[in-house]
Amino acid sequence: AFRDKHALSKANMGADGRSYPIPGGVKCRLYRSFPWLYLQTDKPGTEFVAAPDWYYGFEYPKEIERGYDGYEDLLTTGYFETELEKGESIIFSASLDQMASPGTIDDIFADSLARRTHKIDFISCLRHSARQFMIRREGGAEVVADYPWEGSDPRQTLVALPGIALEQGRTEECMQVLDRIAEDLRSGTDRIRRQADTPLWFFWTLQQLEMHVGAEEVWKRYGGTMKGALESYRDGGMGRCILMHDNGLVWAAAENVPLTWMDSVIDGRAVTPRSGYAVEVNALWYNAVCYTLELARKFGDEGFTAAWDSLPEKTRTAFAERFRIAGEPHPADYANETETNAFIRPNMVVACGLRYTMLDEAQRIEVLRTVEQHLLTPKGLRSLSPRNPLYKGRCEGSPGERDFAGKNGSVWIWPLVFYVAARFGIEGDGFLTAAGELLSHFEEDIQSDGIGSLSELYDADPPYT
């Protein structure tokens, strides 16, 4: 197609349908601005028949369903002809690099076979899928946010990294990714300063890393970054839109610019603004401060301990005051000068599933009960209670309609991590059976939609597709 991944090809006079012979095949390039595409086989005597022609009107039903153009024209430059004996095989290579010989093609194919994982059950499919998101770039490992739309996103990287890397035994690669993010935190890049919670997810990921390398290695390698990140909130280093107030809570507000993970924008306006004190941001903030204090005390950083020791209690007190909703057992989703927002969203469950939480056990039980009554589905947690008038049970229609539904109903998987952690924190091993049942609901998805992987989100109404 020789096009951008977000565009579709249409028949045009500018496309070059010519092909040029090379050893073992041909090279072609539809447009001058693109690299050459090398088409080769490992079978000597295979002939390429040049027959440039347009094929019109390929239909992509899913694209049409999603409100996009779903018809494409594709140009072929020709086809290969050869004769095969019974049982004989042929390997075809399409690459941006020319293969030096048929043996090179065979070697690359054999190496690819050797590196394949055996996808024989649900867990092995998940392990294989996790491998695909970890890529190598100059300077180390990196996590791709999703295929095929995005590159690396620091928030999504930090949330996914324990499962993608640590649980696969890829500890060194995990630390390479964290090193890159640590550098971004120290330099204050724009992609960090536009996300109120991302530096705080860094601390949560380090807590998972600690279980694999120990507290001393975490403090030695990242202690300076941890302290600097906290100071950037306190001292205004995150910019005027994101900062710690005198009450110990983190404030994040910018006109029509969403600063939390609920970051969809339609026609220049945030779908879920959540300006002010956001519940998961402050839960993560409290966890980050307490964790850094824990390590500072353990490894003798008296200066940091003296400067920050009184903050957790101040933050807990302010959280209890600002997030209290009269007559409701759960905390607010966010609070600012004009409202204490009582929408039931999955953000509150983050406050229950962290190592350090501002909620006592009775409060966590009430939050979990609320989550189970309003948000829990077989596929994850809804992004909004069905009883809310803004709720959308189907993620369908135009891009704008889907963006709205995505944060106002659609089910997300990742908050399940904190729901499960909170249940284990209260029930211990008594939750094992129920946790296994939650996981089993995803087994059938491995064979549909994203083959071998799970979907990012699901419809909020049954059958949760």
Annotate the PLM regions.
Residues A1-T465:
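Acidic, mature catalytic/reactive cores of soluble proteins
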